Amino acid sequence: MIPKVYLNPKLSLYERRRQLIAVLYERQSDTVGNLAFEFNVSSHTIRNDIRILELEYPIYTKIGAGGGVFILDSSRLL
């Protein structure tokens, strides 16, 4: 199955970040490399997006085995 995001690779900065949040809420986690591939951008771009989004959303990253980008389920924040 082709990821939905990859079908429309030319997204604005705002739209890419909005869809990145949606993808993370749907999956709960993913790797930077996989997200970069799906959004048709570099890993560096995804890392920059994550740094900005961490300021407003419960996103965190983990390096190493089992690492990636994670988002906390909003129901767990209460």
Where in this protein do the model-derived segments appear?
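Short, basic/aromatic recognition patches that contact phosphate-bearing ligands
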Residues: 1-78
